[in-house]
Amino acid sequence: MASSSSQRRCVFVGNIPYDATEEQLREICGEVGPVVSFRLVTDRETGKPKGYGFCEYKDEETALSARRNLQSYEINGRQLRVDFAENDKGTDKTRDQSQGGPGLPSTTTVTESQKQIGGPVDSNMHQPVGLHLATTAASVIAGALGGPQVGSQFTQSNLQVPASDPLALHLAKMSRSQLTEIISSIKLMATQNKEHARQLLVSRPQLLKAVFLAQVMLGIVSPQVLQSPNIVQAPSHMTGSSIQDAQLSGQNLLPPLAQRSQQLSRAPHSQYPVQQSSKQPFSQIPQLVAQPGPSSVNPPPRSQVKVENAPFQRQQVVPASTNIGYSSQNSVPNNAIQPSQVPHQALPNSVMQQGGQTVSLNFGKRINEGPPHQSMNRPSKMMKVEDRRTTSLPGGHVSNSMLPNQAQAPQTHISPDVQSTLLQQVMNLTPEQLRLLTPEQQQEVLKLQQALKQDHMMQPS
């Protein structure tokens, strides 16, 4: 016990100039407290000093104070290195025996701390790390946290952190062994009491920053790791809702068509299951059913029409049983969209329903209103899908008079300005926005865009 207590009261003093005497060193060590003894180690053969010695104090507190205050004390052009005797006695003896003097680089000694962190062999474990290394490490951390980026090769001109950074200045005065001891203490605390270590670092963010800065200075954390994209960028796998929020915050497509929930009852003979559609940021775009281009051939008798209940909600797929005839004289593609309102006892022949009104996009043209059973005696640009029976009417004639016991919702046309705005939004969809849609929706939007371009070219200038 006495030997252990004596070692804790004794400090190792290294990097002593060869011309310094024991009296000078005793006076220097006596500045922090009473000195019991000081021994300057000399070579047995030559009698010359080896450049280090040992100072014993009366108590451990004085020895600890000497370790803090005498570190980097300058004497005759050298800075003293002070540490506890049991930590550095064997290391410095081995170094001096292999190199023949203090302060020379060693190639045979690797300290335990260097083995743990995998750093290179360095004889200046007790020398101050210096302002350049501290500010360089602080600059790397600042770049990783969003500040100016610093390359892997650092020069004094590349330093982005001001020299007045108090934390960097303080760590610059410490040696590598002291920084290693701090990191080891934090690691030991985290191992023994994880919650206490977490509370300590959270309550003292400067301590957390100092530990991080010390790891960069010692090479435990390399600048290349801090500059990797995984540190400074957000993860690439964003959830669907976050992508939708980001897209919808910047633009809201077809706002009049996304204000109320929509419902469509399934036809009695329908055997198609209800499908759950994936969430799409642009699900407000109505489904386009008509095929562009003049044709005298009827399309397939059973086409599927997707009806969206609301943005980001379920969709229903209802088989359509109407054969739509195309007139060979109709040079304008039939690409109109006619959503109609459907209550809970909904009309099964409705293609789209929206907010209590029927919306018809007829390339900016108004279509004459008429009773629900009135047939149109000219090529039609509107299409209705009937689920109760199959009807084939050439020339685009669609009649609702054959539907029994059904109430027709009142038809209301939106203003030409709104129609023009909606069509313009469809035409201005970017490829990135189209990729967010389903393949069927992409094809239908492309067909509508092509039809709008053809109609615009055919209109007189």
From Swiss-Prot:
GO MF assignments: mRNA binding
Record Pfam families: CSTF2_hinge (PF14327), CSTF_C (PF14304), RRM_1 (PF00076)
Annotated segments matching region Disordered: 84-127, 260-282
Annotated RRM domain residues: 9-87
Keyword annotations of the record: mRNA processing, Nucleus, RNA-binding, RNA-mediated gene silencing
Gene that encodes it: CSTF64
Effect of gene knockout: Impaired antisense-RNA-mediated gene silencing (e.g. suppression of overexpression of FCA-mediated FLC repression). Reduced fertility, early flowering, reduced organ size and pale leaves.
SUPFAM superfamilies tied to this protein: RNA-binding domain, RBD (SSF54928)
Role description: One of the multiple factors required for polyadenylation and 3'-end cleavage of pre-mRNAs. This subunit is directly involved in the binding to pre-mRNAs, especially on the 3' non-coding region. Required for the targeted 3' processing of antisense transcripts that triggers transcriptional silencing of the corresponding sense gene.
InterPro entries from the UniProt entry: CSTF2_hinge (IPR025742), CSTF_C (IPR026896), CSTF_C_sf (IPR038192), Nucleotide-bd_a/b_plait_sf (IPR012677), RBD_domain_sf (IPR035979), RRM_dom (IPR000504)
Name listed for the protein in its UniProt record: Cleavage stimulating factor 64
GO biological process, one term: mRNA 3'-end processing
Chain coiled-coil ranges: none
Lineage: Eukaryota, Viridiplantae, Streptophyta, Embryophyta, Tracheophyta
Domain of life, source organism: Eukaryota
Extent of Polar residues compositional bias: 105-116, 272-282
Gene3D superfamilies attached to this UniProt entry: 1.25.40.630, 3.30.70.330, Transcription termination and cleavage factor, C-terminal domain
A GO cellular-component term linked to this record: nucleus
CDD domains: RRM_CSTF2_RNA15_like
